[in-house]
């Protein structure tokens, strides 16, 4: 073919590709922004990405790399440190907030920003309950929060958590072979939350539930594509099995509701069955089951990952490990000879361990943001947030911001010495009216686990140079394959 003809044709083809891709990149902008009229002029900076996908490919690419925070850094580098950006993420037009001020604004303003969840979350956690009115949600939240909060409730669980931790560590320290440490932490946390939800535990029941929850979690972090082979499809099947199992548990509890139970045997499920509104109306079973699913889910993920990362970070810093261990030894020395086991008062004396836990939760923040939705047209620092758009509170963006935390990639518990936390700068459990009700219980589990681990065990990693994977959650790519070795 004549080269004089070939080159112009190639140039036309490449030019057509550029025009086509440019057109595709503008579709989301035209569809979501163009319809806003004058309001579009006061939107925050940012771009809407590709049709349907939005900017999800850029987000996933960042979290599959060794620098997951590059996604937010790119926004800051490109548009300046506004703390608020427009985007299209998790299949919806979005406003990203990632500074303490903007995060606090969204989390605290319940009048303008309500709960917002991706469609996959609504389907898997229960549309009827996730979509309840604010007043109804407050009433149910009060019922489900009571078993988790306050010194009286926490004191009741110390001994139980202790027993589980001691038994689990004893078993792991005896088998003399590597275990998947993250999975063991999940089993521990699930057993604890299972006791609180059901009052008593059946190992078989909890093992079955944990299996279903593994599939459910994968679906929560995936697009809502209900086709065999996709994670969401498997998660829907797991939810059906979980609902069936919980229906059986509910029926069994109803049958024995007339039989007097010991106070220590009552769980959240019993409180929900007994609950009545001002008109004497009881909760429907569908709402009870959804609430149980939500609380079982929220109650075990955070503590499992934080416990694992605390051990890993301390392993990487022997001087910090020794300091944390010495603090636990001092607590034992001060203990009366007649006392057996930990008390809540002793846990409150673990000043250095508290800093280790806070730093662990900051450093190992999840990539999933906190989802909110604008109830009305709102304003954040002079920028318009259109009604119906989702607002993503980017906790990791705050926790890893060098202007908020010096050298944020370093694990440094001493940064919490005499530290005054600026509102919105430390939000591992969210904030405002929707703050995680199980935050105190999560920390209690971590304290008790680390107390016994530091005193009596060490971790021998099988792959010390194992890279970190950030999807779906930050973890060693081998899920922390290690031997638990008894040293005490």
UniProtKB/Swiss-Prot annotation:
Keywords: Heme, Iron, Membrane, Metal-binding, Monooxygenase, Oxidoreductase, Transmembrane, Transmembrane helix. One of its GO terms (biological process) is pollen tube development. Heme binds at residue 436. GO terms for molecular function: ent-kaurenoic acid monooxygenase activity; heme binding; iron ion binding. Coiled coil: none annotated. Pfam families: p450. Its EC number is 1.14.14.-. It is a single-pass membrane protein. It is found in: Membrane. Its cofactor is heme. This is 7,8-epoxymelianol synthase CYP88A51.
